[in-house]
């Protein structure tokens, strides 16, 4: 009986121990279950984080690819801008050289214009002198013409006198037989008339020579006037051509200056764009 009691007590103890172990096991299982649930929750969170990380990584890769593309595009633009700047620098150098040559041509044209102006002024002075001389020659020609008309009148008068003398001579010759005195008087008068006629003839010859010389001088003056007028016209033409050349060169210089200003503004704009591009690249 005691053995049974002992055994029952032992079994009860064992049962209590078993219950304790079962409770401990259940607690342990519950703890393990809770831990497993926490682990599974953490795993789910980790998976979500991994998925988010993968998404972020994909996005970062896309952003990196986009940034690389933008960087390559920017570098390409920078290279193109640098090439354009170099080309602009060469263009500016050429423009400056062209401006220097244009200034030299302008100086030369200005010197030629001044020379042409001086020549034109000199030609104008000569022309005025020649006009004055021409006016004097015209007065002389008028005087000679008046003298010639007077000589012609004298010649006509001499012709009339000669006709009268001839008529009287005929009358004297007709009356010669009737009156020697009248014939002698008539002969003396004929001698006087012949002397007068000789003087008139000499005057006519002198007037003819003077007229011929005056005509020769007038022709010479007219030739000189034509020569001076031609030289004056040529000088005026050269002056007009030089003035047009100066105007053309001035327009070309203005155009080059405008183009140079435009190129400088464009260079400034490109420099600002380059600075902005470098700032954007530095931001990446």
UniProtKB/Swiss-Prot annotation:
InterPro entries membership: Tropomyosin
Keywords: Allergen, Coiled coil, Repeat
Bias type Basic and acidic residues, positions: 110-142
Coiled coil is among the record's keywords: yes
Similarity-based family: Belongs to the tropomyosin family.
Domain observations: The molecule is in a coiled coil structure that is formed by 2 polypeptide chains. The sequence exhibits a prominent seven-residues periodicity.
Protein's recorded name: Tropomyosin
């Amino acid at each position: 009986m005691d053995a049974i009691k002992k055994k029952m007590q032992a079994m009860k103890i064992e049962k209590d121990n078993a219950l304790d172990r079962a409770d401990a096991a259940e607690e342990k299982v519950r703890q393990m279950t809770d831990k497993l649930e926490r682990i599974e929750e953490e795993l789910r969170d980790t998976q979500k984080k991994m998925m988010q990380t993968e998404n972020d990584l994909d996005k970062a890769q896309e952003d990196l690819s986009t940034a690389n593309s933008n960087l390559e595009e920017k570098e390409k633009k920078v290279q193109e801008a640098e090439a354009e700047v170099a080309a602009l620098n060469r263009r500016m150098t050429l423009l400056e050289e062209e401006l220097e040559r244009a200034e030299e041509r302008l100086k030369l044209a200005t010197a030629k214009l001044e020379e042409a102006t001086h020549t034109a002024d000199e030609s104008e002075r000569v022309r005025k002198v020649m006009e004055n001389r021409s006016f004097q020659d015209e007065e002389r020609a008028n005087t000679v013409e008046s003298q010639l008309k007077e000589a012609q009148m004298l010649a006509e008068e001499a012709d009339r006198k000669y006709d009268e003398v001839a008529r009287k001579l005929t009358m004297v010759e007709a009356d010669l037989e009737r009156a020697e005195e009248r014939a002698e008087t008539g002969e003396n008068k004929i001698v006087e008339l012949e002397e007068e006629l000789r003087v008139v003839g000499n005057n006519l010859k002198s007037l003819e020579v003077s007229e011929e010389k005056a005509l020769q001088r007038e022709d010479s003056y007219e030739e000189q006037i034509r020569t001076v007028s031609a030289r004056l016209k040529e000088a005026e033409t050269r002056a007009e051509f030089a003035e047009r050349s100066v105007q053309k060169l001035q327009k070309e210089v203005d155009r080059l200056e405008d183009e140079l200003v435009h190129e400088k503004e464009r260079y400034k704009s490109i420099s600002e764009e380059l600075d902005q591009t470098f700032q954007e690249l530095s931001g990446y």
